[in-house]
Amino acid sequence: SLERNDFIEGLNLSDAGTLLEKFKKNNLARLELQSNVHLEFPYLDILSLSIRGELGWISDNKVDSFFHFYCGGMTGIKGYSFYSIQGTKKLFLDFTIRAPVFSGKHYKIGWMTFQNSTLGLINQLGDAWDPNKFLLKKSVGIQLRINGFSFYNFPTAIELEYHQPITKFNNKGIEYGPGKNRNNSKTYFKILFDF
């Protein structure tokens, strides 16, 4: 997509003493590609493999960071914070192997009925970078999904994930990744209508 952006850079005072916005042009071309593939393992019908990939490119490397790709947090490499990985180029790969815990059951707990559950192992890698600063970041995680209904007819999907960063790096003076004196793992909990 071609974007024409007038991005507010600051405020000035007019002769009358009112605030006037100061804008800067941040025009750019943005290209994003995404793909998902879901496979079953031969001879192991209970295991499935999901592969998700994303590529991104922004034409102007000096564009304001507001327009950058962010490749951490819930939408990216989950072992890192959302704003920790950013840049005008993006590469992201997610490999998830899932096995059923139970399937086709009706376990009732209060107003909820659970029908299916899977356990997954996740390996993620990628980066969002500015030119000549590419460093492949990696994260591993475990995922529990439970699917069913609440209040007899509302589809309910519950997901709990735990992720551990593997790659250590520094972004704007802040250190991310594994450390001796800190636990940088991330936990994500979602309740949705579907996965």
Describe the residue ranges of each PLM region.
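C-terminal transmembrane beta-barrel domains of outer membrane proteins
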Residues: 1-195
